[in-house]
Amino acid sequence: MKKIVFVLLMLGLCTSVISQTTKDVSGAAKSNTHIKVFNQAMNTGDLGTAIIALNYYISDQGSNNTYADTLAMIYMQQGAYAQCYYWSDKRLAAKPDDKSLMEMKGISLEKMRQPKEAIDIFEKLYAKTKSPYHAYKLMEMQYSIKRLAECIATANSAEKLQFKPEYVMTYNVGDEMGRTYLQAGIFNIHGLALYDLDRKAEGKAYFERAVALDSNFVLARQNLEAIKVIEGKANKVDPNNPQNPGSPANKPKQN
């Protein structure tokens, strides 16, 4: 299965964290030299300087403020996941139910190759939000470490959620990038999990549902085509020498 780029929710997260920081800032904080540098850096897109300014500010004023949340978010934007994890985890000690911090911590754990810990976070997050995006991310991680029954349970829960046409996602196929409906992405992973549990007909049906939603969804089309190839070969197998075809996710694809 090709890696899905989980960016749209993060863009919303970044906007919400920054806007919340702006609303929560006191007049004294706005006049602080480090915050002035931070604001100037953000206005010019200089995230490196923004990080330095916030570190100086937090060093002086302490971490019990929303600028620490913003620092975690900027570290995530920069791909500095260990630093993002540090600050999101630290802030969750003070705000254990903050969904933005939970999301940043979970994604950081995944990027740091700690999928089990990331799954624990996203299970709690999805229970709070019932967000289709969080459902997809949880399924993706569950499938990645072959927690297939859990992945299917999450998929079944996600089917009860409301999906809107604007719920979309991007994905990579080799050097190319595609775009599809979030629900199609959920159907695709659901199909892979079912197929890997030897529920091949059900898995195929979910690939077909994904393609029905978006006929240009390359990953689902590849998986569906792989199943047809496997089925064709299975029909030609000598009954005295049966084979056990693998998952379509393991078939060679474009890289």
Region annotations inferred by a language model:
Residues Y67, L101, H134-A135, Y167-V168, ...:
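TPR alpha-solenoid repeat register
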